[in-house]
Design a protein with these regions (language model features):
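Acidic, low-complexity intrinsically disordered segments
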Residues: 2-255
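Flexible glycine/acidic-rich beta-alpha junction loops that bind and position SAM and/or redox cofactors
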Residues: 29-30, 133-139, 165-166, 222, ...
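Short acidic (Asp/Glu) and glycine-rich catalytic loops that position anionic groups and cofactors
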Residues: 29-31, 225-228, 254-260, 356, ...
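Conserved beta-strand positions
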Residues: 22, 101, 128, 262-264, ...
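Structural recognition of alpha->loop->beta junctions
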Residues: 142-167, 310-318, 376-392
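Radical SAM enzyme core and accessory elements
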Residues: 1-22, 91-96, 115-121, 425-605
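Short helix-capping segments at alpha-helix termini
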Residues: 61-64, 119-124, 283-290, 354-355, ...
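Radical SAM [4Fe-4S] cluster-binding motif and immediate context
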Residues: 192-359, 364-366, 370-372, 376-379
Length: 605
């Protein structure tokens, strides 16, 4: 069986063609326009996985020796989706084929159904899969209204993972017997030795930096109440082998892809992490492959022997860390007890010492949060934690999470518009903030963290740590600029916004071409001129700091080495709340107990 088959499909005139259109939908902004770019920033792991599975099915002639799969992929975040063209292709092929809307998150579900509605009106078979469908069917006692509406249109809903199941779906579509629902949530497939994720270069180049992606594993052992991963992918670690990863990397490298985003929710808890990193290190050494990696990890990864070191040797230049909050009560309430604030400084300094740029996700809206406490916590982070890039999220009860399930069962108010479940909108009531206050502090949090003085501090820390200052400023521009100028979250960001006039959300008036052109021109100028000026000032500041010899010796509280007994020091991180004081006391007690154990061992030795 072919594991990765990036070659051309065979299409001869005497053979039957079966169309497979893979679509990763975008979602709508607050004005009803699609969020779409000339180049996207974040690649779709689901699209890569489904394309690889479809290639494997193609190589095995699953529909018969005389039937060819004609596979096309579309990521709507970086490409105008040719719905009319797809309909024409299917019409020319007597509607033989299927459109699969893949990896559909809750905020993308409304757009996915809008696409499917047009296709179903033309008689084209359509299936929707992804976290929204899987999460709802896994956690809710009944099908939610938006999914019932999809079923009424004749759309097939697919819950679970497509490995070992795509063959059946394609055969059912080929034989015109698609059921309303596939539900494989009770049977999560193994990953080792299976078909591998792949996207041809013509698709990969639509992402900034030609960034490829793959999941080295799925599942997470933790139990965060706001997370959907554990209920959709399970808590048991499933992973690819080192041989799988080598074949995957080689296939991508053959077409010029050298940068990868490992999309595991927590690569540090992938039980095969060391073998995978060792193999990548060997590929870099033996085959001279230039490989760069971005990965996601937890706040305790630095305590895993050799994890940071081998990540760096494998090419890790940037790492995303689920910091979430610095209030232990908030972390405990979200069942995120694995995050210990007393380990934050050690963990961040371990990555800083390794010259790896850190991104930290921070959630606003835990029950104890107020605008004042959020402002205070951001100031503490700026002063005492050597985080590089911060990105903020509003606490959101995502379907598939325990939070959503419990709120649903209690009958609590939640936003009915799935398009707003993007972690940028208030989708539930907060006990201490109004929706307006919550929304306001979310907007201000970005400006508070990326203040002019702290941007200067971030660049100074980068230079003092031996990091590339240009990497720091480019990430500041991308993350802060996405919010400040494009008004979207960086994870939905990209280069040069497209805003197709004709693809506005149903219910919004389609603008007159002339008035749209005038407004869009004004909007473009007021977005990119300030953005370019900000970039100019960033570059000027970067060069100034680079050229200052004193910058290499810069030191502040965040960079100061962690020392024994620092829990008693004047660090507000450990004194900002009663729960922070308790966390420091517990860390102090653990350290003392470890000291006593070492003393006893030395005495016995």
């Amino acid at each position: 069986m072919s594991r990765v088959l990036p070659g051309k499909s065979v299409n001869q005139t005497n053979r039957t063609k079966f169309l497979v259109e893979l679509i990763k939908p975008s979602h709508y902004d607050d004005d009803g326009y699609l969020i779409q770019w000339w180049r996207g920033f974040v690649p779709s792991s689901s699209l890569s996985n489904l394309y690889g599975l479809a290639l494997d099915a193609q190589s095995r002639n699953i529909l018969g020796e005389d039937v060819d799969l004609d596979i096309e992929a579309h990521d709507e975040t970086n490409k105008n989706l040719p719905v009319a063209g797809i309909i024409r292709r299917f019409k020319r092929n007597a509607n033989r084929g299927i459109v699969l809307l893949v990896g559909v998150q809750t905020n993308q579900f409304a757009r996915a159904v809008d696409i499917a509605r047009e296709l179903r009106a033309a008689g084209i078979p359509v299936a929707i899969g992804g976290f929204h469908v899987s999460g709802c069917l896994a956690m809710l006692p009944e099908t939610p209204p938006e999914m019932k509406d999809a079923l009424a249109l004749g759309i097939t809903l697919f819950a679970g993972e497509a490995e070992h199941r795509l063959d059946e779906l394609l055969r059912a579509a080929f034989e015109n017997r698609l059921p309303p629902v596939y539900n494989f949530m009770a049977d999560l497939p193994g990953m080792e030795g299976g078909p591998l994720p792949f996207l041809p270069m013509k698709y990969v180049k639509r992402y900034a930096g030609a960034l490829g992606c793959f999941d080295a594993g799925r599942g997470c052992p933790f139990s965060c109440s706001f997370c959907t991963i554990i209920n959709v992918q399970g808590r048991k670690s499933r992973y690819r082998s080192a041989n799988d990863i080598e074949q995957l990397v080689r296939a991508h490298a053959a077409q010029g892809v050298k940068s990868f985003f490992i999309t595991d929710d927590n690569f540090a808890r992938n039980k095969n992490w060391e073998a995978i990193l060792d193999r990548i290190i060997e590929l870099k050494r033996r085959d001279r492959l230039k490989i760069n990696i971005i990965m996601q990890v937890d706040t305790m990864c630095h305590k895993i022997p050799h994890f940071v070191e081998k990540s760096v040797r494998a090419g890790c230049k940037k790492v995303f860390i689920g910091l979430e909050n610095i209030n232990p009560d908030s972390l405990k309430g979200a069942s995120k007890g694995q995050n210990r604030i007393t380990e934050y400084r050690k963990m961040l300094q371990a990555w800083k010492k390794a010259k790896v740029l850190t991104y930290a996700g921070y959630i606003l809206g835990f029950p104890s949060d107020t605008p004042a406490s959020i402002e205070r916590d951001i100031a503490i982070i700026q002063r005492e934690l050597p985080i590089d890039i911060m990105e903020f999220f509003m606490l959101t009860p995502l379907p598939g999470s325990k939070d959503h399930q419990e709120m649903y069962l209690r009958g609590e108010r939640m936003e009915v518009d799935t398009n707003k479940y993007d972690a940028e909108h208030a989708t539930a009531d907060h006990p201490r903030m109004s929706a307006a206050e919550w929304q306001d502090i979310y907007q201000r949090a970005w400006h508070l963290y990326y203040s002019p003085s702290h941007i200067e501090t971030l660049i100074k820390r980068a230079v003092a740590s031996g990091m590339r200052s240009r990497r720091m400023t480019s990430m500041i521009f991308y993350f802060y600029g996405s919010h400040a100028f494009e008004h979207v979250h960086p994870l939905q960001g990209g280069i040069l916004r497209r805003k197709p006039r004709t693809q506005r959300r149903p219910g919004y008036k389609r603008e007159n071409p002339l008035s749209f052109f005038v407004r869009r021109t004004r909007e473009t100028l007021t977005t990119y001129l300030p953005g370019l000026w900000f970039f100019h000032r960033l570059e000027r500041l970067r060069k100034k700091i680079e050229n200052d010899p004193a910058s290499k010796h810069y030191m502040d509280v965040a960079l100061s080495p962690v020392v024994d007994g620092e829990y008693d020091a004047d660090l507000e991180l450990y004194h900002a709340s009663d729960s922070a004081v308790r966390a420091a006391d517990q860390a102090r007690a653990r350290a003392e107990e470890m000291r006593k154990i070492e003393v006893r061992r030395a005495a016995a030795g």
